[in-house]
Amino acid sequence: MDRDLNEDDSVVDLSFEAESPLAPPTELLERLPSYDWLLQGGRGQIFFPPLEAPGRPQEQRSWPSFLEHRVPAMTEEVAREALLSFVDSKCCYSSTVAGDLVIQELKRQTLCRYRLETFSESRISEWTFQPFTNHSVDGPQRGASPRLWDIKVQGPPMFQEDTRKFQVPHSSLVKECHKCHGRGRYKCSGCHGAGTVRCPSCCGAKRKAKQSRRCQLCAGSGRRRCSTCSGRGNKTCATCKGEKKLLHFIQLVIMWKNSLFEFVSEHRLNCPRELLAKAKGENLFKDENSVVYPIVDFPLRDISLASQRGIAEHSAALASRARVLQQRQTIELIPLTEVHYWYQGKTYVYYIYGTDHQVYAVDYPERYCCGCTIV
């Protein structure tokens, strides 16, 4: 169960990132013994989610009612209109072919696409810091830090990926900046604190080689103002932003991820599988719950096997490192038609796929490139 946090346990949203020393202050970890692993130089540690009791499997479904769905039949008129729309979207394809071709044969096939989405949440802790600006410090003196899975946060909508960072309550400690040693500024590396550098024109000689007059760039001084620090000899510390102190704390990183498994049933036509994976289909079945179970007894055995394989893969990949929040599995019908047509004594082929009649034409005649016809 989630632990209710009081007002002192409020979670601060973070957006600051800075250069980090090799290890966190030992004083901080002495007060936070559960985070002592950071002393070994750990960048971040995954905290395993609490185990939850599995739900009960759903009842066996009656598939015949689902299979009553049918996509509209492909006709020669629809096939020609689909090709005309495709040609109109291409600058180098002749529309004459689409208007004059003779359709000889339509080979239709309906495919099934199975898709499994698993929306999960993982939590990682890491040590970080930011410039201290004299605001109140939420340190261990205010109480014990909550366990990372007890911290309540508002997550994104289901199946929408996101990453957010939060400050762990009661984990803060103020220390002198390790970069500038509490000065807020440090010596410029360009001029070593002098504020000036050797003139690049005369190389510090005050005069150019084989010339008697003084160097015009440095006015004969042999030195130029340092461009790195604008002549000040020092720079504001980039780590503490001139504040001289740093606020060290434990940071909680929460990642919401949507894992995807897809499978398209086998087909006998030569349309590329990657196009079919992205095709728009007609929804045949949808199952969404905190946990979904493998589909059984589907008329296409490959779909049932894909469902079993996808759920097993996601379970194995996420069980030990993330909390599954929601799962969704769908089956879609993808219509596919192979169109054989005749044009000027030759036979060609194109494919119409998806419910929105997308076209794949690999050998379309009368294509143009920069005004030249591709034969």
Curated annotation (Swiss-Prot):
GO terms for molecular function: heat shock protein binding; unfolded protein binding. The keyword Nucleus applies. InterPro entries: HSP_DnaJ_Cys-rich_dom, SSUH2_homolog. GO terms for cellular component: cytoplasm; nucleus. PANTHER family: PROTEIN SSUH2 HOMOLOG. Plays a role in odontogenesis. This is Protein SSUH2 homolog. It comes from Homo sapiens (Human). The gene is SSUH2.
